[in-house]
Amino acid sequence: MKQELIERFTRYVKIDTQSNEESHTVPTTPGQIEFGKLLVEELKEIGLSEVTMDEKGYVMATLPANTDKDVPVIGFLAHLDTATDFTGKNVKPQIHENFDGNAITLNEELNVVLTPEQFPELPSYKGHTIITTDGTTLLGADDKAGLTEIMVAMNYLIHNPQIKHGKIRVAFTPDEEIGRGPSHFDVEAFGASFAYTMDGGPLGGLEYESFNAASAKLTFRGTNTHPGTAKNKMRNASKLAMEFDRQLPVEEAPEYTEGYEGFYHLLSLNGDVEQSKAYYIIRDFDRNHFEARKNNIKDIVKNMQEKYGEDAIVLEMNDQYYNMLEKIEPVREIVDIAYEAMKSLNIEPNIHPIRGGTDGSQLSYMGLPTPNIFTGGENYHGKFEYVSVDTMEKAVQVIVEIARRFEEQA
């Protein structure tokens, strides 16, 4: 199993599948279509049925039941794309067998070193086989580790028919990293009662709480005149943006928050005297606090409009996704089965809120309750990203055990 994980994963990460927020096509990049087509062929080779890829790049497949019991249809999902935060082109995965727990020089020429001082969890992987970058790209373990694990788990179940299971549906979605993964996902066609995203991090991760999320785009309009004669005439749009930001609580930003704490996050700010644009995201686990944050932004805008004129600021605010907990609680048994599966494999479940979102956040509100499970990756979205193959193997075992337990309890 370990060799299959390494072979598939290292092959998959070499395909550039970064999504593109500026694109309006679905999927947003051609690499995702290329990858999807490859997976369609490999799913067929493994022996899955009903293998499809639609024109928008959504891949679906079925592992038929091998039991006469009436078992709920369960699904496993991962996403095709990788993050936009750092380049994912020409990924050169580096395999480190029997890792000694010490610093790894990823790139001598560029002096890129993965150190325990910077990443304290690193020594805990001593003895593992880990896969790193070469220091020039991200790795793409988010989410090609999860995708690989699903492929290997399906292959394992087909070759071990003594493990009884109900019908299993598999799906690989595009554009998750830019929040569009479920936008064109056909829940009815997928046909599962519930599902699990394989899109978590270190060993034991089991997540079923996510942020409530919104975006706020602000356009500040100024009046430009010659600075020598600007008194009582100039209105500086960039300074309006700065004035707006100063009215948000300084300590309620990502760099000062953790756990269940929400935040405002200024993603980008650019402009000049004539016009300036600021793009924020708003996050909170508590729905009331989430609404209060959005109202705070609206109030600041209203007060500044009264001061500078209604045309001085334009606000566009949109909800992105909601805390999946509300939709998971009524079917709590899907979390319990995953929890029990981990415990039976001597994995200590690490239940914590997702300080972000997964496809499951949106899918849960589309009628497909979908918690999230670990994949074995660390330091996602950058050159220090790595994955433990040993933990990937554990994730495969969890998928298999979840399928077995649903059949056993039917």
Swiss-Prot record:
Its main location: cytoplasm. PROSITE patterns: ARGE_DAPE_CPG2_1, ARGE_DAPE_CPG2_2. CDD domains: M20_peptT. Keywords: Aminopeptidase, Cytoplasm, Hydrolase, Metal-binding, Metalloprotease, Protease, Zinc. It comes from the Bacteria. One of its GO terms (cellular component) is cytosol. This is Peptidase T.
